[in-house]
Amino acid sequence: GLELSHISEGESPQETLSKPSAQQGLIRFCGDVARQRPEGGCWLDALADWRQPLVLMVAGEAGGGVAGAAAAYAALCHQLGAPLIGLVQIGSQWNRLQRRRDGLPWMGWIPAAGVPERELALDHLVQVLSRRSITAAATGVGAHRP
């Protein structure tokens, strides 16, 4: 498996992303990737520059909806050239029709513990993530741009 690093928005993007563990593993970012840093730029700028593949985790709302921030962050990734692999809905109900209509690159959902579809949904998510990761690697995602 890959090493999982935990970082927060207060850490230096350049220092963190230049570490071998960040280049070869997964990063769980806690905070707002679009928040402007005092020295300029934001984490999302750095992730785009380093071609770090991204998966956005989005909280599900009652009834299976998601906040508009999901579309806003996906658009910002596109604008900055950040390699967005896809979005994953956390919790609530999975509304396949709504997810198709919003046109975002959804990978699936992670149902709450105890939900009957949990194992099937997680298996599907692993398959989609694997396929998209292979595609990302083949297109040079993860290679730092100077």
What is each residue range found by the language model?
Residues 14-25, 67-74, 145-146:
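Charged, low-complexity, helix/coiled-coil-prone segments
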Residues 127-146:
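Charged phosphate-binding loop/patch that engages nucleotide di/tri-phosphates or the phosphate backbone
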Residues 29-131:
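Conserved catalytic-core segment of NTP-binding enzymes
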Residues 4-13, 19-40:
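Switch II (G3) loop of P-loop NTPases
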